[in-house]
Regions:
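Residue(s) in the substrate-gating loop at a strand-loop-helix junction
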Residues: 143
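Conserved glycine-rich Rossmann-like NAD(P)H-binding loop of the short-chain dehydrogenase/reductase
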Residues: 32-47
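Conserved NAD(P)H cofactor-binding loop of Rossmann-fold oxidoreductase domains
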Residues: 92-98
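Active-site helix of classical SDR
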Residues: 124, 159
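Conserved glycine-rich cofactor-binding loop
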Residues: 16-17
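C-terminal helical subdomain
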Residues: 183-184, 198-234
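Substrate-binding pocket helix/loop in short-chain dehydrogenase/reductase
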Residues: 100-113
Length: 250
């Protein structure tokens, strides 16, 4: 299906690298018109040109700094004005800091919360009427880090756990008749963020994860781990007695 005659638009927030870029490619290939949102305009332009050439896709872009934008939802709404009706919102953008171990300044805590929590809430609130009108899908990206709080990724994990509450609120208030709310608790993925880092498990392939997410758009509301093997890791972490868990401070 050519995206030039596509009946609907998917918004990918965090579209310039890793899973977001893989999702942009997968959705373009499936015939969606796209609004790609990321912080770097040049990266977005290059991705859009590639997707337009390879898939005859209709692609709009919006450069947005989620750490500093007070109302990202309003900016995205304005960018959607000339695109087909909105059918999917995929909130992939996220950031973590190596020193998120109770060492962060107030300013850097604010940056983490702006990107990982404020922006998803603001964007969902702004786009909710459009998504309800089309019975669309909201995809939130959580993290295995939220399974149990540790002395690392303190703010990041707190924000990701809060997204679990947002997902539950969307399901309770609007699913299944008005929209679909899908939460993916992501494990380690092979991206530039994990390159060169010694990981405790084999990282997942962003292209494979993107295909799974794209294939499930519109197919119910749920929360699940991706890659699926990380569900066992999270279950073990939650089941550990406190005396054992508290020793895992590395």
């Amino acid at each position: 299906v050519s995206a030039n005659v596509s009946a609907s638009t998917a918004v990918v927030v965090g579209a310039s690298s890793g899973l977001g870029r893989a999702l942009a490619t997968e959705l373009a290939q499936r015939g969606h018109a796209l609004l790609l949102v990321a912080s770097d305009a040049r990266d977005l332009q290059a991705i859009a040109a590639d997707l337009e050439l390879r898939f005859d896709a209709r692609v709009a872009t919006l450069a947005l700094d989620l750490a500093r934008e007070a109302d990202p939802g309003a900016r995205i709404l304005a960018a959607l004005a000339k695109l087909p009706p909105l059918s999917a919102l995929l909130l992939v953008a996220g950031v973590s800091y190596d020193d998120d171990d109770f060492s962060l300044s107030a300013a850097r805590i604010g940056e983490l919360l702006s990107i990982n929590l404020h922006a998803p809430h603001a964007i969902v609130h702004a786009l909710l009427p459009k998504l309800r009108a089309t019975r669309g899908t909201i995809v939130l990206c959580g993290s295995i880090a939220a399974a149990r709080g540790r002395g690392r990724n303190v703010v990041y994990a707190s924000a990701k756990r809060a997204l679990e509450s947002l997902h539950e609120s969307l399901r309770q208030a609007h699913a299944p008749n008005e929209l679909r709310a899908q939460l993916y608790r992501l494990g380690f993925l092979a991206t530039n963020l994990t390159y060169g880092i010694k990981l405790p498990m084999t990282a997942g392939d962003p292209d494979v994860v993107a295909r799974t997410i794209a294939a499930r758009l519109g197919k119910g509301s749920f929360a699940r781990y991706l890659p699926r093997r990380f569900a066992l890791v999270a279950a073990i972490a939650r089941a550990l007695p406190w005396f054992a868990f508290r020793r895992m401070r590395g």
